[in-house]
Amino acid sequence: MLEKSKSRKENDRKDRDRSKKENGRRDTTEMRSRVKRCDSEEEERIRIRRDRKSSDFEEEEYERDSKRRGEDKGRGRRERDRDRGKYLKRDRERREREKEKGRKKQKKERSREDCNEESDDVKCGLKRKRTERSRHGDDDVEKKTRDEQVEDEQKQLAEEVEKRRRRVQEWQELKRQNEEAQIESKGPETGKAWTLDGESDDEVKSDSEMDVDRDTKLENGGDAKMVASENETAVTVSENGGDRAADEDEIDPLDAFMNTMVLPEVEKLSNIVIDGILDFKMNGKETGDQAKKGFNKAALGRIIQGEDSDSDYSEPKSDDDPSLDEDDEEFMKRVKKTKAEKLSLVDHSKIEYEPFRKNFYIEVKDISRMTQDAVNAYRKELELKVHGKDVPRPIQFWHQTGLTSKILDTLKKLNYEKPMPIQAQALPIIMSGRDCIGVAKTGSGKTLGFVLPMLRHIKDQPPVEAGDGPIGLVMAPTRELVQQIYSDIRKFSKALGIICVPVYGGSGVAQQISELKRGTEIVVCTPGRMIDILCTSSGKITNLRRVTYLVMDEADRMFDMGFEPQITRIVQNIRPDRQTVLFSATFPRQVETLARKVLNKPVEIQVGGRSVVNKDITQLVEIRPESERFSRLLELLGEWYEKGKVLVFVRSQEKSISDFKSDVCNLLIATSVAARGLDVKELELVVNFDAPNHYEDYVHRVGRTGRAGRKGCAVTFISEDDAKYAPDLVKALELSEQPVPDDVKAVAEGFMAKVKQGIEQAHGTGYGGSGFKFNEEEDEVRKAAKKAQAKEYGFEEEKSDSEDENDVVRKAGGDISQQQITLAQIAAIASAASKAPVTANQLLPNGGGLATEPGIPPTDGAGRVAAMIAAANVQQYLAKIQADAIPEHYEAELEINDFPQNARWKVTHKETLGPISEWSGASITTRGKFYEAGRIPGPEERKLYLFVEGPTEISVKTAKAELKRVLEDITNQTFSLPGGAQSGRYSVL
């Protein structure tokens, strides 16, 4: 029994040991399998992530290759989607196969878990401990290295500070030695000048005082400063504070000093200050140190608005100072520069521009397979005329342009089925990077012809950041056309993520500036407002450095409206290798020659000939006098008002275009300003109440109706007084294949017959330009004519070329130069008096009234001339006596009417005129009346000006020069503000 029980216990013990071992082995296996499972899952996640990246890269590579080869250009959208689906399906199947292989591999690893022993656990534990120890050791090493680096940096910084401190001490010691050497070389100063600073505060200190002050500076570490004030005595302070030897009395020492010393001297100086200023340099001589140092304001105790400030009124200037003799005309030209002149030119040779791509066009096979005869026939069908070398062939469908899918989808949503004639030819040319001139009738889709290539051009360049200028710049003549182009661009730019900003006058400039500062790819603008923006804040708002695509819409109208200087200056500031596009409904020869200066080997496109009215417009021309036009207009309104909108062109604008376009009213009465770019839906009738003054204006007026394939009607009233406009109307009707009324043809033929006979003169085209150019050539011609006239009268040296009537400082009491000229004229014709006795009578003022003076008998020939000379001499002598009786004084004028309002207010205010009058000794008064720009004063009236009068010529010149300086400062401040100088800017519509 005992043996059995022992054997049983032994077996139980063995079973327990065996079970313990099995449990330990099982736990170890589970832990190892769990670790391996985590490692395999991590590997699976990494592999899946790598597969995703590779699939995305392959997908992008596929899209890039397909775009580069142009495989999807000739196929439809369904084929591209089907190929893309097949490719993605194969990729998904490949990824599923790789996942299945990974699962099988995991199963095999789990089946090997029973074969592992406990020794593996021990090895794993030891390995983990070694790894942890090595990691802790690496952390300690890194921490020690970081601390050492910080200590080294602190040591270097301390050494650098010590070096700088030593340099400062050496510099201070060297400066002190130089000052001592200068004082010793000068020797002791004799004499002392009294000033308002007090007796103890001399103008020049003694050597002992300077030494004491210097010692004080050194004791205080070189940081003490000398502070000088008007009523403060110099006090030397020791390092320990020193004792003050000043006792307070019942009377304040400062009050006693002011009452006894300062106030009497101030009264004396106030009596002589004006005389002292006026006598300074008046006699042309200076004495003592003042001849070298100039006028000392502090010596007089007068400091006006801050001493030694450039903006204050300085001492009177000598006669030789060129600023006093500046011509008023040159001053006005310098101060009142236009915004175009203030925009400085850019030297492109000093700027490294980044290269950009122009050519995006790849001709599809359908177009390249066409023969030249087929291309010519297609252009003839579209009524296209092309001038240029290697012109790309016109396209037939939108997908042949090479535009992105987003643009094509937008075209499909807008129901643009196929390109219009101007678009079919312009898109390949502009997409090829060529400069282009597009001439097409109104409503033919010119806007889309330059907008679509611009979007593709912009997407190829790096994105715009804040502070960068635009990439595409579109200029138009009127704000209505700018708004219309902006709305057309917004239809496509929204899908592409491109920002467009309109810049035009008549609206708040603050919002436009904020949008430009944020960065924009496209700017649609009028030339005048764009110049304003570029000049504001010295060009910090935006710039033209990134502009590579320039568009001028209605270019002929911009040149005709006088925007040529602004356009030229803007174009000159854009990089020379830009792409330039010009579009318009009309393009006269004069403007074409001017426009080609800004283009580089352009291709010209014409649709339907040059300046032709759309054939879809029914044109009626009626001969009606002024009295019958209004009743006829009422008949037309009663007939057409219910059919749609009506536009009436007259010489004055009565209604607003915004109400007309927003269906507030169906009738708009406007001038030719509305004839350009105005696109109003459902506009059925156009009435020319007043006949247009040239052919191009008629084409644009009539072109407001019949747009985008719609029908329209145009009625024009003309009378016998408007016969000079009849030939243009007949020409427009004939070119557009419309019937010409017999009475209109008769009026036109009658007028042309009068022109051939020389009775009448044909009017201009409206694009020749008129008025003054205000350039240097015109100034030279005017000065040459003035000089020739003076030479003819024998007074060539009397005045210089730069002098103007208003710039001359003249003596008061009249000028006898006119009488001298009269005498010269009489003497010049004395020799020929017998042949032409009447000539002298015509030259004298008041019709030769001198010959009928009492006591002078009317004679003929030389006797009559001698009598006239004697009478003129008597008048001259009397005028001289009268002038001598009046005290001598001088006067001058300065016109301020055309300056900005702020400048006029400043220069006429008593706070400005008072100090100038007191300082110069001249009297300044405001005369004349303010006239707005464009208004002409009457015969007895004058524009606003300042009248300066003084006892000496130098006083008048000095006062006038100071007034000019004030005007210039305020004018420049006004121009530097956004939208400043409202009175001097051009009208931007």
Swiss-Prot record:
Residues 230-239 have a biased composition (Polar residues). A motif (Q motif) lies at residues 396-424. Residues 321-330 have a biased composition (Acidic residues). GO terms for molecular function: ATP binding; ATP hydrolysis activity; RNA binding; RNA helicase activity. Residues 88-182 form a coiled coil. A motif (DEAD box) lies at residues 553-556. Residues 427-605 form the Helicase ATP-binding domain. It is an enzyme of class 3 (hydrolase). Keywords: ATP-binding, Coiled coil, Helicase, Hydrolase, Nucleotide-binding, Phosphoprotein, RNA-binding. The modification Phosphoserine is found at residues 119, 200. This is DEAD-box ATP-dependent RNA helicase 45. It comes from Arabidopsis thaliana. The gene is RH45.
